[in-house]
Amino acid sequence: MKKILFSFLVAGLLSACGGNESSTKTEAPKTADITKDPAYQKGVELEAKNDCKTCHTIDDKLTGPPFRDIANKYAGYPDTIVAHLASKVISGGSGVWGQIQMTPHQGLSQDDAEAIVRYILLLKNK
């Protein structure tokens, strides 16, 4: 019985001694609100003016892949991917996401297509 009490006493003393650790917790940095990013705002504006929502949503597959899947696939790629993907938006095509062809958007400027791509890439999972 004395051994059990002694064991509890030692365990209590050891747990009370916290060492030199700070008692304040460091909070993890908060994830930035992407809706405040100018690239997000411009992308939403351009998406509304074009036919993107006919085939895409942020999270659900329609005719085309969800924007979040696109963002996750290209996360970590160099910035040069923006111009490449924008040219794919303008020219259309198939093969990357299956055999259903994305319609060309030849009336879209390279700058606007790049703005839409930047918006999409912001939607990646954190």
Describe the role of every protein-language-model region.
Residues 1-4:
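Positively charged n-region of N-terminal signal peptides that target proteins for export
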Residues 17-21:
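Bacterial signal peptide processing site
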Residues 24-47:
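Electrostatic cytochrome c docking/interface patches
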Residues 48, 72-75, 79, 90-94, ...:
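Sec-exported extracytoplasmic/periplasmic mature domains
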Residues 49-59, 116, 120:
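The canonical Cys-X-X-Cys-His
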Residues 57-88:
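Gly/Gly-Pro-rich "capping" loops immediately C-terminal to redox-active cysteine motifs
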Residues 65-71, 90-117:
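Axial heme c-ligation environment in periplasmic c-type cytochrome domains
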